[in-house]
Amino acid sequence: MGRAFEYRKARIMARNSKNSKAFSKFSKEITMCAKASGADPDNNSRLRVLIASAKSAGMPKDTIDRAIKKATDKDTSDYKEVTFEGYGPFGIAIVVETATDNNTRTVANVRSYFTKFGGSLGTSGCLSFLFTRKAVFTVKAKDGIDMDELELELIDFGVDELYKDDEDNTITAYGEPDCYAQMQQYFEENGFEIVSAEFTRIPNDTKEVTAEQRETLDKLLDKFDEDDDVTNVYHNIKEDEE
């Protein structure tokens, strides 16, 4: 362990969407999960943690219930998760995750955003070496928790990085993507309240840009954020120190 500082900074690399966008993302994920593995959270561990994450984000219960119900509706479109990779202007690497019911539309839109700002859409996997994919759980810290002891326990459950945020009294754990289920199992069985659980991509290195370049890149990233099919956007722009 030892990359907690870089991981904390990397959270800023993921574009944080407004509530309406976040709720739309949760709705799609909940519907897809319920459709794939069942609508009963007691028997669908992934759905259970998605619901907990949505609630922590302030998503209304009736909105969550509608998303689950959509999974049993025959008229509900089948969403497919598709990841796009490409270079934006100034050589910035960008990974765009989507959930779409019309891949032709989504490909055309994503390609147009890259092209409009002087970038280019690459082939699948072309940027995999620039990012590390992780499973991330954030839980409420228990009173008097011994972080050293917790860290030692979590190593056996696939966690390779852990840090505590004293400001909001939470603990965030990072592990390999295939350790997601066992990480969830540990936190649930040991009585931790799960605030959020997700997969993320952490840039292995970041690239400095000028203020003018950052302004252009922000416009491109905003275009991705505004697209209803887009669920997550990751990049390797160095964090603005100001």
Regions found by a protein language model. Give the residues of each.
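Positively charged, low-complexity, intrinsically disordered RNA-binding extensions
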Residues: 136-242
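N-terminal cationic and glycine-rich segments that engage phosphates or anionic surfaces
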Residues: 1-113, 118-122, 127-136
